[in-house]
Amino acid sequence: MSMTDVLSAEDIKKAIGAFAAADSFDHKKFFQMVGLKKKNPDEVKKVFHILDKDKSGFIEEDELGSILKGFSSDARDLSAKETKTLLAAGDKDGDGKIGVEEFSTLVAES
């Protein structure tokens, strides 16, 4: 499964372009722009599993740093600051990683 099975390639391209500048990433705006906010819970979970590159059931800090590449291979990596901000927003139980339910909540709060 690829990201374009769930989200529009055009929406992904626009969202990646909007956050091309270093330290410009805003997960709330990004999730809205790619159309993830409008998706049903099962589709949000599909996106989570695509982003969970090592299939551990969690998106760890290193995977968060390359989250944009999960949407488009030519996207940039997040800065350390952006990664930590995203982790802090999504890691509700403080275990240092984002599980599927935490990801679903993060998207819903966007």
Curated annotation (Swiss-Prot):
Expressed in the modiolar nerve root (at protein level). AB domain, comprising of helices A and B, is involved in structural stabilization, protecting the hydrophobic core of the protein. It is required for high-affinity binding of Ca(2+) and for Mg(2+)-binding. Ca(2+) 2 binds at residues 91, 93, 95, 97, 102. Belongs to the parvalbumin family. Ca(2+) 1 binds at residues 52, 54, 56, 58, 60, 63. The modification N-acetylserine is found at residue 2. Keywords: Acetylation, Calcium, Metal-binding, Muscle protein, Phosphoprotein, Repeat. This is Parvalbumin alpha. GO terms for cellular component: axon; cytoplasm; cytosol; synapse. CDD domains: EFh_parvalbumin_alpha.
